[in-house]
């Protein structure tokens, strides 16, 4: 009986999966708040991710992304392109059984955004000089969405998701207005096995 319990426990731990991979997607962004004559602007998302999933269905995804946000302005005659390094930290729940070929999922978590550039449609800098910045260097957001993981072959998964990100902070340093980021994202990634995480020892056993 004791051996059976130990065997089942070891088997469950062995099935807890850690994977990494690249991600690419489309960002569709706009502003909300004290703004007028803005419209949705497409942009690029590219980066990588770290996934952890367990038999219970709960998991975690940490991502490091380059994402283009902003908006079209002046009746679509110009653009504000805000380029961010993003770090979404997403609690994930997978539906279905562990090992199923298709695993639908939902996720929610904070998004740390670090501004690396602000340019107009022609590529001109619109963020002022180092002593007079127009846009804030950091934005905190909330990201939630859903999607599915599809197993292409043993332990190699196609990751697909649709997400919505809402900015929580004013992205400008202007005193007379408050503007926040607002964006949809459609992303595709490919995950490869990294190893097995043992929740009792807190160690990652790589392949």
Language-model features: where?
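Gram-negative (and chloroplast) outer-membrane scaffold detector with strong preference
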Residues: 52-124, 192
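Short glycine/proline- and aromatic-enriched beta-strand/turn motifs that initiate or cap beta-hairpins
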Residues: 13-51, 191-193, 205-207
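Residues that define the transmembrane beta-barrel architecture of outer-membrane proteins
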Residues: 16-18, 38-44, 81-87, 102, ...
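Transmembrane beta-strands of outer-membrane beta-barrel proteins
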Residues: 18-24, 60-62, 87, 104-110, ...
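Outer-membrane beta-barrel "beta-signal"
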Residues: 23, 88-92, 182-207
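Extracellular/periplasm-exposed beta-strand and loop segments of Gram-negative cell-envelope proteins
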Residues: 31-39, 69-83, 114-139, 172-179
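Short loop/turn motifs that connect adjacent beta-strands in outer-membrane beta-barrel proteins
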Residues: 12-18, 56-57, 96-103, 152-156, ...
């Amino acid at each position: 009986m004791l051996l059976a319990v130990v065997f089942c426990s070891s088997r469950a731990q062995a099935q807890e999966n850690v994977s990494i991979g690249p991600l690419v997607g489309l960002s569709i962004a706009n502003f909300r708040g004290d703004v007028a004559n803005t419209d949705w602007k497409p942009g690029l998302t590219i980066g990588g991710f770290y996934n952890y999933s367990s038999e219970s269905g709960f998991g975690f995804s940490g991502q490091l992304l380059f994402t283009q946000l902003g908006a079209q302005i002046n009746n679509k005659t110009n653009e504000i392109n805000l380029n961010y390094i993003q770090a979404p930290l997403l609690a994930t729940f997978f539906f279905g059984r562990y090992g199923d070929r298709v695993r639908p999922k939902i996720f929610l978590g904070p998004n740390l955004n670090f501004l690396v550039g602000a340019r107009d449609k022609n590529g001109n800098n619109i963020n002022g000089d180092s002593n007079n910045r127009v846009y804030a260097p950091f934005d905190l957001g909330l990201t939630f969405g859903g999607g599915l993981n599809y197993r292409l072959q043993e332990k190699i998964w196609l990751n697909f998701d649709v997400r919505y990100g809402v900015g929580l902070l004013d992205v400008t340093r202007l005193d007379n207005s408050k503007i926040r980021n607002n964006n949809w994202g459609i992303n595709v990634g490919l995950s490869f096995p990294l190893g097995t995480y043992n929740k009792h020892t807190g160690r990652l056993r790589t392949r």
